[in-house]
Amino acid sequence: MSDAQRTGLLIVDLQNDFLAPEGAYARGGAVSPAALALPARVAPVAQAVKAAGGLVVACQFTLWPDAQGEPMIAPHLKALRPFLRRGDFQQGAWGHQHVDAILPWVDVSVSKVAYSAFFNTQLDWVLRHAGVETLAICGIVTNGGVASSLRDAHMREYHTVVLSDGCAAFKTTTHEASLADMGTISEVMTCEAFTRQLSAQH
């Protein structure tokens, strides 16, 4: 396998309920403006990873319904996002789906219930069986799902790359501080630089 074929891309939480005008976060007035630019920026990276023979994984934040059909929401999230309601981020629903821009390039979808895409999921199993050694990570938010997933990948001894302009937070200062923090354990590259490096390895 080439280095490119041992490369995986993890796209964190680019879902309709987070980003679409009809989604849950738009309804609650909680969409990150910087995040709206990500699908168009990330899709070419996913396409390049696929073309090079790598694996594209996209995770989906999931709210599972209880016996009465109400979403089981962690207390801290319920306090932070009181607008979340029945049907939001529910598996199989439109809001739970990946945004259209990335759909054609996703090989594997992983449902998650917490910040990290590794927590109580089969992501590590999938990556190892696919031969992935280098994992590039992008999505939302920089200081939440992206940072948590990256640190869990680092602890599992993957070589990690965070795509600096492929992720976003609610505040620029938070985004930049999180990138600087992740830079102590990971490579930090722009989407363009990563794609260029991938092409050279292919």
What are these regions (language model features)?
Residues M1-G8, P44-A52, G69-I73, K78-H202:
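Active-site-adjacent betaalpha module
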Residues Q15-A20:
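Short acidic, Gly/Ser-rich segments with clustered Asp/Glu that frequently serve as metal-coordination loops
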Residues C59-T62, I140:
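Short, well-ordered beta-to-alpha junction loops that form the rim of enzyme active sites
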